[in-house]
Amino acid sequence: TGGSGLKSYELHPNDVNDIGMICGGQVTVYFQLFTPEQTEDIAVLRTWRAQLSRNVDLWLLLALDGERVKEFRVLTRGGIPQEKKEYFTSRAIWHGGVYTEPLARAGRACIFGGGHVGRALVPVLANVDFRVTVYDDREALAKPENYPAADEVVFGSFSDISGVTLTADDYAVVMTPGHQADYEVLAQVLRSEAGYIGCIGSRGKIAKTRERLLADGFTDADLARVHAPIGLPILAETPEEIAISVAAEMIEHRAKRR
């Protein structure tokens, strides 16, 4: 209870501010009280909520003068003040009374094919902060209720995915129900700016798809963009295990980009 302010805690047994931790160290926490009268601050929170669905890089900026808030804002990349640019990274930073924290990162995972593996993959990715779009040409599958953790479900033809724009921040995961559809989607995805491209399948299937793409004019450099077979080699067999393997590779790719 009470107002806003800084509070320090000792993370090891002690007689002052002991919170029962045994790992050691110290943590300082800033508590921000929001009341209905703080209309400007409430507006910032509403902006924050609205921006989360816009697929943009988003940061919190909190500047303190002692324990008084000088500045409380939510910023996209284009709104970052030039003099504070060094504070806006992929990590939370506290320096000289200025605290910044990344709230959202641009980029979504587009899963082309919502079958058994796709359905298992959606909640795994959502739980590690990927925004997820599922794209399928089967009307019975392409329904939001089949993927409650997905941000978007699209019903469309695999031969024409032009309704989905892939940027350099996006992840394309190809796991359609057939070889022909995999080929069609890959041929289109390779012409996009997608930052990550992965395709499920056996090594034999991947080799045949690669041959077709090369025959169509794609280069070895183009195909080097494709993670295939997709996923880290953890000997996964079930859809749920494969989903973990795929998500792990995507997490690794995301971490290396930071």
Please name every model-derived segment:
Residues 158-168:
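Short amphipathic alpha-helix with an adjacent loop that forms part of the alpha/beta core around
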Residues 176, 194-195, 200-258:
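Adenosine-phosphate binding glycine-rich loop
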Residues 181-194:
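Rossmann-fold NAD(P) dinucleotide-binding segment
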Residues 1-137, 141-151, 167-171, 205, ...:
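Segments forming oxygen-rich coordination pockets for charged ligands
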Residues 151-157:
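Conserved SAM-binding strand-loop segment of SAM-dependent methyltransferases
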Residues 137-140, 158, 178, 201-205:
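Short, ordered loop/turn segments at secondary-structure junctions
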